[in-house]
Amino acid sequence: MAHRRRCLLLLLAVLLPAMAARGDPDAVQDFCVPDAGRGRPVELAMLPAYPCRSPANLTAGDFAFSGVRAAGNFSPETGFAGVSVTPAQFPGLHTLGMSFARADLSAAGGVNPPHYHPRATETALVLAGRVYAGFVDSGGRLFAKVLEQGEVMVFPRAMVHFQLNVGDTPATVYGAFNSENPGIVRIPATVFGSGIREAVLERAFGLTPAELRRLEKRFGPPKKAEMED
C-alpha cells in the first residue's frame, strides 16, 4: 500500500505541472465552427454553449476572414489603431486555440502603450514600417530593439510590452496569440482610469493631486470599484 501511494504521488508530481502549463484545451475533433447564426454578434464566453455546425455544410469561406485588410480606428492621443480577432469575430477559429490582431501605428510616433495579455504569448510580425518593440520581464529587465519590415518578436505570456513607430511612414504589425481569448490589460488606463483611490496613486507614483487629475482625465473618468470593501 505504501509503495502504491508513493507511486501515485510521483505520478501526480509529474502530471500536475504539465497540466498547469497547458493553454487552451486540446480539440477533440478537426474543427468546430459554432452554429451561432451567421452575422449575429456572439460573446466569446458563450461559444462553447453552441453546437458545432455539420462539416458537410462548411465551405472555405468559414475558414477565411477579411476583417484585417484595413486598419481600425486611430486614437488621436496615441496614433494607434487595433483590430482584435477572436472566435467571436471569426468563428472558424473556435477550438483551434489561437487568435490574432492587427495593429497600426501612425507615422513618427504612433504608439501601442504598455500592456500585457494575461492568457497568451504573442508573436508580432512587422508587416510595414520600423517599430521599436520590447517587453519587460518579472525581474524588471527590458528586452527591446527596432524591428524592420519582415522581422518578428515574441512577447511572453503576461509580460508588459509595447510598440512605437520610429519610422517616417505608417507601420503595421500583425500579432498572433496561442489562446482564443488572450485578454488585454492596458497599463495606463488600468492604473489611472479604474477608480483606484487617489491616495494610493499619489503615494505610489509620487504625484501631486493636480498631476493625478490630469492623468485621470486623459485615461478615463474614475469608476467605482465594484469589489471595493
UniProtKB/Swiss-Prot annotation:
Similarity annotation: Belongs to the germin family.
Principal subcellular localisation of the protein: secreted
GO molecular function: manganese ion binding
Compartment(s) where it occurs, according to its Swiss-Prot or TrEMBL record: Secreted, Extracellular space, Apoplast
Protein name in UniProt: Germin-like protein 2-4
Keywords of the record: Apoplast, Disulfide bond, Glycoprotein, Manganese, Metal-binding, Secreted, Signal
Signal peptide: 1-23
Subunit (UniProt): Oligomer (believed to be a pentamer but probably hexamer).
Top-level taxon: Eukaryota
Chain ranges of the Cupin type-1 domain: 66-213
Primary role: May play a role in plant defense. Probably has no oxalate oxidase activity even if the active site is conserved.
Pfam families xref list: Cupin_1 (PF00190)
UniProt-annotated binding residues for Mn(2+): 115, 117, 122, 161
GO CC terms, sorted: apoplast
Positions glycosylated per UniProt: 57
Disulphides: 32-52
InterPro entries membership: Cupin_1, Germin, RmlC-like_jellyroll, RmlC_Cupin_sf
